[in-house]
Amino acid sequence: MAAEKCAEEFGDSSAASLKIVPKDYAYPLLEDPQGALTTPTEGGRTLVTRGGFNYFHYGCDGHQDAGWGCGYRTLQSAISWIQRRQGSSGHVPSIREIQQILVAIGDKGPEFVGSRDWIGTLEEFYVIDVLHQVPCKILHAKELSSDEILGELRSYFEKYQGFVAMGGLSDTASKAITGYHCSARGRIFLQVVDPHFVGVPSSRQHLIDLGYVRWVPVDEFAGSTYNLCLILQP
C-alpha cells in the first residue's frame, strides 16, 4: 500500500515549527559507503541508488544508541539522500529531533522524547513526510523473496533509483536497501547498508570488509516478515 497521508491524519503545524539545528560531528561522516562495492556476480543486471548520502551509524554523532537506534540511523541516511537529490541545504535531524517530530504529530506521547524506544519504517515515513513532503510506499512482505515483492523492488529501482528503509519482525535490525542485482542465472541479491557499526570507519572498504555494506542473496532473508519504506523521490 502507499502511505501518503501523514500531514492529513496528524496535522503538522507543531512539527513544522521545530527547527532542525546544524550539527558539528566529531569526524566527517563517510559518503556513499556502497560506492566501493563490486557486483556479487559477473554479468546480469544491477540497479542501484542514484545520488549520494551520508552513512549514519551507531554513535556517529556522540549519541550512544547501540542496541536500539538503528531505525533512526537508517532514517538519517535516507534524509541525507533526499536532501542531496533535492539540492537542499537542510540539516539532518538528530535522534532527539526525530523523537520530537513524532511527538509533535501525535504519533508518540511526550515520554518518547529522550527514550530508547526504537522506530520502524512507518515512523520513518512520517518524519520524511513532515520534513520533505516526499511520498513513500510501504510494503508489508511476508516473504521477501516472493515474486511479487521482488517485482516491486525491481520496478522501484528502475523508476526511482531510490533508497529503501527496511525492518523486520524476527529480523528486527533496521537496514537500508540501496541496490538490486539479478545474476545471469536469475539469482537475486539486495545491496544492504547496515547502520550497526560502532566506532570510526576509516574507509568504505573498512565497512565492506566488516560486512556492514554487502550484497545479500534474498534467500538469506527467509524466516522473517519485513516492512519496507520505498521513498518516492523523483
Curated annotation (Swiss-Prot):
Listed GO MF terms: deUFMylase activity
EC numbers: 3.4.22.-
Source organism superkingdom: Eukaryota
Location of the active site: C70, D194, H196
Gene3D superfamilies: 3.90.70.130
Family, similarity comment: Belongs to the peptidase C78 family.
Protein name from the UniProt record: Probable Ufm1-specific protease 1
The encoding gene: Ufsp1
